[in-house]
Amino acid sequence: CHTRRQRQMCIRDRDKEEHIDFLINNAGAAWAEPFGAFSEGGWDKVMDLNVKSIFFLTQELAPLLRVKGTIDDPSRIINIGSIDGMNVAAFETYSYGASKAAVHHLTRQLARRLIDENILVNAIAPGPFPSNMLGAAVAHDYSEIAKRNPRKRIGTPQDMAGLAIFLCSRAGAF
């Protein structure tokens, strides 16, 4: 949902809902090109989807999050960042790392702004896990990336799901 038209499509059914309990901003894209050839279009595509869409979709859906959020059981927003927003990636994905660093900072700003409205905002910054995006970069051979991890493996969808469930549950309300 990185353009105004796409955001409108994402929220077209918003009026059918009385409230939402949580929002998970999980859309993301990467772009890899050598430094000297890195295109403005690739940069903009990544920044628009990874950062801009999070802000504007959150802005549009905040009224529905405010409805049921209480001091004891706030509504939740989870933004999916990346370790590449904190570390320098091995690939020439300049806009990806910058966008995920922006997601982490935007998360802190939104958390500060929305807490008084009983909306908690957190980010998950996963390491590598099987995905079309990473798979394309490594020809779906994750063995070298796994070797760089102290656990000698890459993450799984269940690793991410467990944390998201915790953050959206009553256990993550404080």
Model segments located where?
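Single conserved hydrophobic/aromatic residue that forms the stacking wall/gate
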Residues: 1-7, 11-13
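Substrate-binding pocket helix/loop in short-chain dehydrogenase/reductase
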Residues: 34-35, 42-47, 134, 145
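Active-site helix of classical SDR
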Residues: 58, 99, 107
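Alpha-helical segment proximal to the catalytic Tyr-Lys
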Residues: 63, 112-116, 173
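Residue(s) in the substrate-gating loop at a strand-loop-helix junction
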Residues: 82
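A glycine/serine/threonine-rich, flexible loop-to-helix segment
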Residues: 92, 116, 123-149, 159
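C-terminal substrate-recognition "lid" of short-chain dehydrogenase/reductases
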Residues: 119, 153-174
